Amino acid sequence: MVTSPSTPTAAHEDVGADEVGGHQHPADRFAECPTFPAPPPREILDAAGELLRALAAPVRIAIVLQLRESQRCVHELVDALHVPQPLVSQHLKILKAAGVVTGERSGREVLYRLADHHLAHIVLDAVAHAGEDAI
């Protein structure tokens, strides 16, 4: 059988990795996966879904990244993100309701901070992954 250099042959098809979406994966990747325990209770899955929905907006992702550095008041977030104050306040309300941020009054302003820095890791991983795909 004659093949062109760009046509893979059977000898080249199973080289131990396949290309999926720009990422390398072992050809037999599912055989190597550990067996996972039973899924968490439905309440935990629902709570995780709510948390991820609260983070699922570009402005809210940017807010979490800003608060990762230090606590901020609304006008600091407006200046850093270049979005209108009512929009920042609306997104902070959603993040606060989801338990992502907390607010503490300081004089006439409210200082917002992350309730849990584990959430910053989720956002950082998502942003890093999106950046890999953009290259």
Curated annotation (Swiss-Prot):
Domain spans labelled HTH arsR-type: 40-134
DNA-binding annotation, residue ranges on this chain: 74-97
Gene Ontology molecular function terms on file: DNA binding; DNA-binding transcription factor activity; metal ion binding
Chain positions recorded as Zn(2+) 2 binding sites: 129, 132
Entries under CDD domains matching the protein: HTH_ARSR
Cystine connections: none
GO biological process: regulation of DNA-templated transcription; response to zinc ion
Pfam families listed in its UniProt record: HTH_5 (PF01022)
UniProt region (Disordered), positions on chain: 1-32
Basic and acidic residues bias locations: 11-31
Alphabetical keyword list: DNA-binding, Metal-binding, Repressor, Transcription, Transcription regulation, Zinc
Taxonomic superkingdom: Bacteria
Sequence positions that bind Zn(2+) 1: 116, 118
Induction entry: Induced by zinc. Negatively autoregulated.
SUBUNIT field: Homodimer.
Protein name: HTH-type transcriptional repressor SmtB
Source organism of the structure: Mycobacterium tuberculosis (strain ATCC 25618 / H37Rv)
Species lineage: Bacteria, Bacillati, Actinomycetota, Actinomycetes, Mycobacteriales
Recorded name of the encoding gene: smtB
